[in-house]
Amino acid sequence: MRTRSCLVSLALALSFGAASATAQQRQITGRVTSATTGDAIVGATVAVVGTAIVAATGNEGRFTVAAPEGDVTLVVRRIGFKRKSVPVPAAQSSVEVTLDPDVFNLEAVVVTGQATGVERRTAPNAVATVSANELSRVPAPSVETSIQGKVPGAVIQQNSGAPGGGIQVKLRGVSTLNGLSAPLYVVDGVIMSDAAIPNNQEVVTLSNQGSNPSPLQQNQVNRIADLNPYDIDNVEVLKGASAAAIYGSKAANGVVVITTKRGESGEPRFHVSQRLGFSELAHTLGMHAYKDATDATSFYGAAVANTYCPPPSGACPVFDHERELADRKDLSYESAVDVGGGSENTRYYFSGLAKKDAGIIQNTGYWKQSVRANIDQRLSSRIGVSLGTNFVHTLARRGLTNNDNAFVSYYMSMGFAPSFLDLRPNASGVFPSNPLGTSNPLQTASLMNPSDEDVDRFVGSVKATFDILTGDRHRLQFIGVGGIDRFSQQNALLFPPELQFEQISSLPGVSLLTNADNRNANWSANLVYGYRPASGAFVATTSAGLQYEDRELGISRIVSRNLVAGQQNVNAGTSVSVVQRRERAKDYGFYAQEEVLTLQDRLFLAAGVRGDRSSNNGDVDKYFFYPKAAASYRLPAGAGPFGDVKLRVAWGQSGNQPIYGMKFVSIDATQNITGLPGLVVPPTVGDPSIQPERQTEIEGGVDATLASGRANVEVTLYQKSVSDLLLLRTLAGSGGFQSQFTNGGKLRDRGVEVAVGVVPIQRADVSLLLRSIFFSNSSKIVELPVPAFRVGGFGTNLGQVFVEQGQSATQLFGNVPDNSLQGFHAQRIGDVNPDFLWSFASDLTVQRFNLFALAEWQHGGDLLNLTKLIWDLGGTTADCPTACTQRLAVYGTDTRQFVESATYFKLREVTLSYSLPASAYEWTGAHDARVSLSGRNLLVATGGNYTGMDPEVSNFGNQPVARNIEVAQYPRSRSFWLTVSVGF
């Protein structure tokens, strides 16, 4: 939170309460501006060294500060700029201060504990920070999309092209095999839910009735997508246990700390932004266009060929079903407004957002409305309170895609609709049936009620600070934080009886209604004690605290079949079934941490421990402890090109709690026998002694600035080991259960992160900032106390992710032909994990123009393209009929035909903006105005043998290891935007 960052910054500037001002004082006035643009800097802090006196700059960058008589030194700092010490002689009463931009965020305060932080240039961990400006250049479907390519060590990928999100964030490789894989999200101290609740479309698609019964094949959205990116001030990413240990048993997958914007002292400042744009289909699979009856006969036979490619010419008509389905370019928009300001004691920030992302398929899209109010109040010189509230409403319509054993979703059914079929409606609006399949995808997109996912969400937070003790050498502060995150989600899907696949059903017409209610509540109480001896030899910060979290989720699903025509209500069917699930978990934790900054602020040492217990564990009263230790040392300035060199090392442990239900037997009470209630036990039983997975990580690195601060390099090497993995072990059939959850085994990740930034040009009229991020990780199963097993995919016929001791945790297994009696055997055929990710960013400013571009290159890695199999079966793949027939001939014996390259190069963001001259807007009372053109994913290049829609894909949603499985996904799109933003 910015409040925390400011407190830490002020604490460093004031040296924890040096001597107070003398009785004789004078007034010093001044103005703070940017050294590169000359613009006023609002909200900069101006501290008088050796006193407790601090002032802040107002709207025009001006300040007035009381100072003792005699010579003094002012320290001026602002987030995003380098601090500056300014000597002010006794005879001088005014100063002009210019601050250089801190383009590498070295002076930003980053998280080191629950209630503490340290400047990034001193931090012993590789903590990534993404600023508000970096988040909002190009509209994005979710916050995670906005940080793609900007965080070393992070693989951030969408699961499909559907509007509304569905993004996975993986930090430093594999952290679990069967546990939760998402990072912990903390927003202004509130632990946010990132639950992904399926919409229950599997009732119709039967995706869970094939070789993989997973319910996560329904293109679900993880709920962090609800956040408004415009409200975010910065994002800090703690990537591993060495940095996130203080968050305990929920931090094994990393921690994403999000701080929202706060008001600043001064007159109200308004910002209004209006964006208009559209999305378009970026890539098609390419359907084979059958030329004539002879061509069509080779796959479909003479009867079909002569019907649709009739004599005497025998020519086949050609219809582009892909573009008929997904070629919409409807208007999208984002309207955002915010205002912030306040006095010395009261500050406020209010914002509002209205957003629409139009889908490229009929009846799909995403809408969001958000309002926020953040208020900071100083009740006295010692007591401060910060409040935050956020109301969000979202509506997602994501269509019908992904795996489908009923062959009714868009791209599954399209695979059985060759190019010579006309699927368009007639003049009366009636769609024809697909004679070669079970569904007409154009009819489904038009008539299916658009799978509304309606979410209402409230997030509230409160933070109270009390300066218990403030003296020359000591400072003791109490920090209390509490918050609640609550959302309700409703999914309503209607498959009317008029649909082709419903007409052949014994109970035509299906209405699905899912209601989910989630509540996360947490509070923490923290004490932070700072001490600095009279000698000033060191600064010690001791922190300790307690934390409590209560999570509750309830889901009810209603399925109604055989509907009365035209009715959607679930009571309009003759066959109705109801399923309900409830879960609740409580966590308790405490921590203690010590931090020391010494040797003229060059040596930083930290050590701490976190203790956690949870109702999800087998023993609810047992505490699990997670220690950490870290150190960094900034070398004295040396000769040559190096300006500042920091050596750092950190070690720590964190955990990953068992998923709710892994410790007991979940009894199904929905069964009945002749109307009498009955109980059914599942095939898998819990373990009453289940405990969290334990991650141990060590990282080391070097950070260096070069060329007088015009270049910065960060290099990090890490190794993390995860023990007590959450596994399934097979049980003897005589016991009544097939398997049981258990702890055991060990996996290891090793990786390297490199971040480079260079400012080759920095003048008043021209500046250029270049950034590059490189990341590579490899994982290995070190120990496995159970037989090798599948964690994703559909068996060796179609390929699967296979866990095996001594092998990569992300290897792909499949069938390969041999000379045996069976004719094939299973072996490794690829690996999901890429060789590396490499991103490149350029930020060029020429006078009033700014051009920003971000590209990301993923090299290596494999995926399973099963969409190609579906289209092969239907004879519609681009290389049919010859090549697809050859592939079908070896189906079941050679899975390698589905393995394709996951390499891609994506131009993720491009923005060209122009700052209007004052003469263009000053008559309105505005103080700045900007116009920009931007685009997202404008260019995508893929690996040589890739033939699918997008290598950034996951049929099973967010997964620990089983990504890169493509089955009839929502197609990829590119977006274009025009933005006008004005500040008052």
PLM regions: where:
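Short, acidic Ser/Thr/Gly-rich low-complexity loop/linker segments typical of extracellular
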Residues: 51-62
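Transmembrane beta-barrel wall of Gram-negative outer-membrane proteins
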Residues: 187, 233, 324-399, 455-460, ...
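Cleavable N-terminal targeting peptides that direct proteins into the secretory/outer-membrane pathway or into
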Residues: 1-26, 82
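Residues embedded in well-ordered regular secondary structure
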Residues: 129, 150, 162-167, 177-179, ...
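Short, acidic, small-residue-rich periplasmic hinge/interaction motif at the N-terminus
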Residues: 31-49, 73-82, 91-136, 144
